[in-house]
């Protein structure tokens, strides 16, 4: 990728990540507003989950179109690691060196923006990823959850149904399920940029725990998922035929 194209890709990543953190962080408030409008009782958690999953589906569909329109922009750094390990893409080191910081900066902007824009009655719904256990347990949880969701996303996108609506519903349901599974451990994030944005807001972005739990282990989980997907689900590359003498 030429330098100009790489810079444009990094700028697109920053914009998309900003918008993703801004919108995704508002899902809790949006769910509360919708359930309140529908008159759903506060204890009916399954209805709230249905609303959240539906809203997330709309968000994923919208961002899929947006990322495509911007030439393949991404709002999650682990996408590159998973795609590389799966043999689906091979980004240059220069590209990664520009796009990772751009995504982190976009996430910081998104987290700061939603913190300012969120109405007072919904401020309590703003809860970014936070470590609720010891660092080693949190790192293991974040790595395992990232592995699970990455493998699921790869399968749905590459091998899953061709119907866009069904594909989006599978993705949103999987994401919500994994978030529920990791809620008592790390938040969870499964997106280092998103975690960094909220860590910056809460002033613990420059700690070892943040790097260890929300960057190193998710990358390990994503790369392992990509490698397993490549071995299990993708056909091996054809061997070149040798000419007989």
UniProtKB/Swiss-Prot annotation:
Keywords: Membrane, Repeat, Transmembrane, Transmembrane helix, Transport
Short motif (NPA 1): ranges: 76-78
A GO term for molecular function: water channel activity
Cross-referenced InterPro entries: Aquaporin-like (IPR023271), MIP (IPR000425), SIP1-1/2-like (IPR044222)
Comment block on domains: Aquaporins contain two tandem repeats each containing three membrane-spanning domains and a pore-forming loop with the signature motif Asn-Pro-Ala (NPA).
PANTHER family (UniProt xref): AQUAPORIN SIP1-1
Similarity comment: family membership: Belongs to the MIP/aquaporin (TC 1.A.8) family. SIP (TC 1.A.8.10) subfamily.
Official protein name in the record: Aquaporin SIP1-1
Organism: Zea mays
Classification of source organism: Eukaryota, Viridiplantae, Streptophyta, Embryophyta, Tracheophyta
Originating gene: SIP1-1
């Amino acid at each position: 990728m030429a330098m100009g194209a790489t810079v444009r890709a990094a700028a697109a990543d920053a914009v998309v990540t900003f918008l993703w953190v801004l919108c995704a962080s508002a899902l809790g408030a949006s769910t509360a507003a919708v359930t309140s409008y529908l008159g759903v009782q506060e204890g009916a958690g399954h209805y709230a989950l249905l609303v959240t999953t539906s809203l997330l589906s709309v968000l994923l569909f919208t961002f899929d179109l947006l990322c495509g329109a911007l030439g393949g922009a991404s709002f999650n750094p682990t996408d590159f690691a998973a795609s590389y390990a799966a043999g689906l893409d091979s980004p240059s080191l220069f590209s990664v060196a520009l796009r990772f910081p751009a995504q982190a900066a976009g996430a910081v902007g998104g987290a700061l923006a939603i913190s300012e824009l969120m109405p007072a009655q919904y401020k309590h719904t703003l809860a970014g990823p936070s470590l609720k256990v010891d660092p080693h347990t949190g790192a293991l949880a974040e790595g395992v959850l990232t592995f699970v969701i990455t493998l699921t996303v790869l399968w749905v996108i590459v091998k899953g149904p061709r119907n866009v609506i069904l594909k989006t519903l599978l993705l949103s349901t999987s994401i919500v399920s994994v978030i529920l599974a990791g809620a008592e451990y790390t938040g969870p994030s499964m997106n280092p940029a998103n975690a960094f944005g909220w860590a910056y807001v809460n002033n613990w972005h420059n700690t070892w725990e943040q790097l260890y739990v929300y960057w190193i282990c998710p990358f390990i989980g994503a790369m392992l998922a990509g490698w397993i997907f490549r071995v299990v689900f993708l056909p091996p590359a054809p061997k070149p035929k040798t000419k007989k003498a």
